Amino acid sequence: METSLRRAAAPAGAVAERTVLRNGGAVRDAVAVEEPLEIRVDGDRLATTMRTPGADADLALGFLFAEGIIAGVEDVGTVIHCGRPGEEGYGNVMDVRSAAGMRIDPERILEGRRFVPVSAACGVCGRLSIDHLMERIHPLPAGEPVAPALVAAGMEILARSQPVFERTGGLHAAVLVGRDGAPIASAEDVGRHNAVDKVVGAALRAGRVGPRAAAGPAPALLAVSGRAGFEIVQKAAAAGVPVIASVSAPSSLAVDLARAAGVTLCGFVRGERMNVYANGERLGLTGP
């Protein structure tokens, strides 16, 4: 399967330099940037997440979609950075505004509201309850089979989509891949759940995800660096992505949710060698 993809360039503002001690001397070294992003809906502050700057609009859209606050881009009029140059926090506030004639349900916003800032490592911290999340997951249909070769191709694309990691060693990455093996969206972030929100948000804007997606085939695979936790499976299921591939292990709750949601969950992927923890029949396998 063809997996050629030009290596992506690092987004502006994603890399900083700091002085470090190395081999008895002081040198300048590249480090990944981590800054807060406040997400608002129609001016109402909803959440603050620690993220790496870049694709902030996609991050906000993907976050709201995964939370069930928006059903699709049809709900959204504009997504803008707030403030003026020189103001404290300029560029670190995104305001998602409702489309004309439509208002996002405030009660739905309150149901998804987080009581504490969202760290880069936690995609579900502060939510009212895990049970509330489970109630919003609808099992995916079996659909068409997916070739194991697509999983391997997705991981190759993932490896080519990490320019900031190559410079800093400090970021996670996610990529959405179509059934034809072509990349739909890729992103890096200090938080793995943020990287997933970014690619889902990009796919939403491109018309590839959502209830009215019609711009092209839906994503068939989400490939992620690091482990596959509960929040990764939840976000993939919300976006209708049938297969998740991770370079590392899933958690027990991720496996349980994947089985309940009809998502094929693959871990420790090395080429076409992998552990399949849930719904292996989609890959032509028998078992979990």
From Swiss-Prot:
GO terms for molecular function: sulfur carrier activity; sulfurtransferase activity. GO terms for biological process: Mo-molybdopterin cofactor biosynthetic process. Keywords: Cytoplasm, Molybdenum cofactor biosynthesis. One of its GO terms (cellular component) is cytoplasm. It is found in: Cytoplasm. The active site is at residue 122. Mo-bis(molybdopterin guanine dinucleotide) binds at residues 268-273. It comes from the Bacteria. NCBIfam families: fdhD_narQ. HAMAP family: FdhD. Belongs to the FdhD family. Required for formate dehydrogenase (FDH) activity. Acts as a sulfur carrier protein that transfers sulfur from IscS to the molybdenum cofactor prior to its insertion into FDH. This is Sulfur carrier protein FdhD. It comes from Anaeromyxobacter dehalogenans (strain 2CP-1 / ATCC BAA-258).
